[in-house]
């Protein structure tokens, strides 16, 4: 081992520069508020569909009324039906878990299956 290496491991370790000083325009953007779609929270009521009335009567599987028609995704139909999870879904990026379904709602405001993460009201995963 080099004797100089034991004395000076990192010559810049004593320098501390806050990130705002490195890019001052970021500090100004932060004060002005979020401007990108990624930093804005999702609107809670983004569905255009009206809430379904909860009719008392016999319940099917998973507590849903037994008389409802099969699940119809709101998208272009590329995703297969049944992508709702019984528990929290995997949290990796790119997981196909945003199955937006209007006929088997978990809450009255967005009509999505449980743990779909389409809206903030359905986000159970931290």
UniProtKB/Swiss-Prot annotation:
* Coiled-coil spans in chain: none
- Listed InterPro entries: UPF0574
Disulfide connectivity? none
Which residue spans traverse the membrane? none
Q: What family does the Swiss-Prot or TrEMBL record give for this protein?
A: Belongs to the CYSRT1 family.
Its Gene Ontology cellular component terms are:
cornified envelope
Where in the cell?
Answer: Cornified envelope
Q: Which GO terms describe its molecular function?
A: identical protein binding
Q: What is this protein called?
A: Cysteine-rich tail protein 1
The segments labelled Disordered in the record are 1-89
* Source organism of this protein record: Bos taurus
Major localisation: other
């Amino acid at each position: 081992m080099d004797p100089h290496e034991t004395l000076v491991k990192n010559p810049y370790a004593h320098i501390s520069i806050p990130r705002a000083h490195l890019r001052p325009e970021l500090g100004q953007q932060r004060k002005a508020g979020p401007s990108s779609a990624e930093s804005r929270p999702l609107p809670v009521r983004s569905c255009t569909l009206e809430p379904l009335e909860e009719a008392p009567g016999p319940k099917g599987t998973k507590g849903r009324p037994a008389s409802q028609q099969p699940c119809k995704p709101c998208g272009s139909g590329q995703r297969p039906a049944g992508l709702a999870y019984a528990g929290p879904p995997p949290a990796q990026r790119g997981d196909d878990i945003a199955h937006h379904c209007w006929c088997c709602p978990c809450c009255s405001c967005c009509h999505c299956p449980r743990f779909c993460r389409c809206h903030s009201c359905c986000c159970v995963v931290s």
